[in-house]
From Swiss-Prot:
It catalyses: acetoacetyl-CoA + acetyl-CoA + H2O = (3S)-3-hydroxy-3-methylglutaryl-CoA + CoA + H(+). Keywords: Acyltransferase, Isoprene biosynthesis, Transferase. Pathway: Metabolic intermediate biosynthesis; (R)-mevalonate biosynthesis; (R)-mevalonate from acetyl-CoA: step 2/3. One of its GO terms (biological process) is farnesyl diphosphate biosynthetic process, mevalonate pathway. The lineage of its organism: Archaea, Thermoproteota, Thermoprotei, Thermoproteales, Thermoproteaceae. The active site is at 82 (proton donor/acceptor), 114 (acyl-thioester intermediate), 236 (proton donor/acceptor). This is Hydroxymethylglutaryl-CoA synthase. (3S)-3-hydroxy-3-methylglutaryl-CoA binds at residues 30, 114, 155, 203, 236, 245, 268, 298. SUPFAM superfamilies: Thiolase-like (SSF53901). It comes from Pyrobaculum aerophilum (strain ATCC 51768 / DSM 7523 / JCM 9630 / CIP 104966 / NBRC 100827 / IM2). NCBIfam families: HMG_CoA_syn_Arc, PRK04262.1. HAMAP family: HMG_CoA_synth_arch. Catalyzes the condensation of acetyl-CoA with acetoacetyl-CoA to form 3-hydroxy-3-methylglutaryl-CoA (HMG-CoA). Functions in the mevalonate (MVA) pathway leading to isopentenyl diphosphate (IPP), a key precursor for the biosynthesis of isoprenoid compounds that are building blocks of archaeal membrane lipids. CoA binds at residue 241.
C-alpha cells in the first residue's frame, strides 16, 4: 500500500503591504532598530472585503486546483485559526459549501494558537491512514492582530495556506511525525479582548525554543535523522530571528532554512506561517528532497514532520497555480491610515 503524504498545496497572501518603517514613523520608533530586532521589512494586510474565511477559501481552492481532484473526494476539512469572524460558527462548514465538498464530510475548526493548522494535518493524516477517508484537507488561516503601538503590531499579519493529504498522487510522502507540548503561558487573549497579551520573557526560551527544539530534536533522535538528511527545514516564523536561531541550535545550515522564510516579506501569518513556508519550499523542491517541518503554537507546543518529495512534484509545480514567490512579488503598499481602515481598527461610537 502506498504511503500517506501531501497530495497538493495552496496558499493565499493578500496583496496589500505596510512597511515596518511606516508603522515606526507613526509611533516614533527607530525603523532601523525595529527591522534589526524583528527582521521584518513589511507585512501583509487583508483588504476591507477579506477575513480569515475568504483567505481560507482562496488557499483551499488553489490546493484543489493544483491537485486536480473532484472536491467531493475530500472526506475531512480542518481549519486552524486565531481570527474567527464568528465567536460561535465554524469556518470549516463554510468551506464545505464554498469549495463544493460533499455534505458527508468531517469538518472541524481546530484550536492551538499558531499550530492549530498543523493539528489539522495530523488529524487528516490519521483518517487517511485508517482508511476512513480518501483525502483530507487542512487550512491555516489568520488575520492576526497586534495592539496599536505595541511591538506585536510590527509582525502580526494576514495569509492562508492549505494542504491536501491522501495516498494517491502523493508529492511528499510522510516519513515521521513527533509532538512536544507543555503548559506554558507565553501568549493569550481573554474572551472579549480585542488584542492578545504576551508574557515577554516567556515567548523565547520557555516557549518557542523549548518546544521547537524539543519537537525537532526529539523526532531526529527517535527516528535516527541528522541535520544533513534534510534539503529544507521550515520552522514557525513569529519574526525573522527565531527560526534562524533555532536552526543554529540544531546545527542546521542557513541554506536549508532560508528558502522557506517568508516572515521578512509578509510578517507572522500565525496559523499560515510554517505552512506558508512549507508551501514555498514545495514550489521549488525536487524529487528525493527531505523536508523537516516544525510548526509552533503558543500555550505551548510544536509538531515536527518529515516528508520525502516524490517524482510527482514536478507535475504539480506546473499546474499554473500562483506560487508563494509570485504572491510575495504581487503587492501594493499602503500607509498607516489605510492600514487602520482595512483592519477595521477605527471604531465609531454613538
Amino acid at each position: 500500500m502506498s504511503k500517506v503524504g501531501i497530495v497538493s498545496w495552496g496558499a493565499y497572501i493578500p496583496k496589500y503591504r505596510i512597511r515596518t518603517e511606516e508603522v515606526a514613523r507613526i509611533w516614533g520608533d527607530d525603523p532601523l532598530r525595529i527591522v534589526d530586532v524583528y527582521l521584518v521589512d513589511e507585512k501583509s494586510v487583508e483588504s476591507l472585503d477579506e477575513d480569515a474565511v475568504t483567505i481560507a477559501v482562496e488557499a483551499a481552492r488553489r490546493a484543489l486546483k493544483r491537485a486536480g481532484i473532484n472536491p467531493k473526494r475530500i472526506g475531512a476539512v480542518y481549519v486552524g485559526t486565531e481570527s474567527k469572524p464568528y465567536a460561535v460558527k465554524p469556518i470549516s462548514s463554510i468551506l464545505v459549501d464554498a469549495l463544493g465538498l460533499s455534505n458527508n464530510v468531517f469538518a472541524v475548526d481546530m484550536e492551538f494558537a499558531c499550530k492549530a493548522g498543523s493539528e489539522g494535518l495530523v488529524a487528516a493524516i490519521g483518517l487517511v491512514e485508517s482508511g476512513r477517508i480518501e483525502y483530507g484537507m487542512t487550512v491555516g488561516t489568520d488575520t492576526s492582530q497586534g495592539e496599536p503601538g505595541e511591538h506585536l503590531e510590527y509582525s502580526a499579519s494576514s495569509g492562508g495556506a492549505s494542504l491536501i493529504v491522501g495516498r494517491d498522487g502523493v508529492v511528499a510522502e510522510l516519513e515521521a511525525v513527533y509532538s512536544y507540548v507543555s503548559d506554558t503561558p507565553d501568549f493569550w487573549r481573554r474572551e472579549g479582548s480585542p488584542y492578545p497579551m504576551h508574557g515577554e520573557g516567556f515567548t523565547g526560551e520557555p516557549a518557542y525554543f523549548r518546544h521547537i527544539i524539543g519537537a525537532a530534536r526529539g523526532l531526529m533522535e527517535r527516528y535516527g535523522y541528522k541535520p544533513s538528511d534534510f534539503a529544507y527545514v521550515v520552522f514557525h516564523q513569529p519574526n525573522g530571528r527565531f527560526p534562524v536561531r533555532a536552526a543554529s541550535m540544531l546545527n542546521i545550515p542557513m541554506e536549508k532554512v532560508k528558502p522557506g522564510i517568508v516572515v521578512t516579506h509578509i510578517g507572522n501569518t500565525y496559523n499560515a506561517s510554517a505552512l506558508m513556508g512549507f508551501a514555498k519550499v514545495l514550489d521549488i523542491a525536487k524529487p528525493g528532497d527531505k523536508i523537516l517541518l516544525v510548526p509552533f503554537g503558543s500555550g505551548a507546543g510544536s509538531n515536527a514532520f518529515v516528508f520525502t518529495v516524490t517524482e510527482l512534484i514536478t507535475e504539480r509545480q506546473k499546474s499554473g497555480v500562483p506560487t508563494v514567490e509570485d504572491m510575495l512579488r504581487d503587492k501594493i503598499y499602503i500607509d498607516y491610515a489605510q492600514y487602520l481602515k482595512m483592519r477595521k481598527m477605527i471604531k465609531l461610537f454613538e
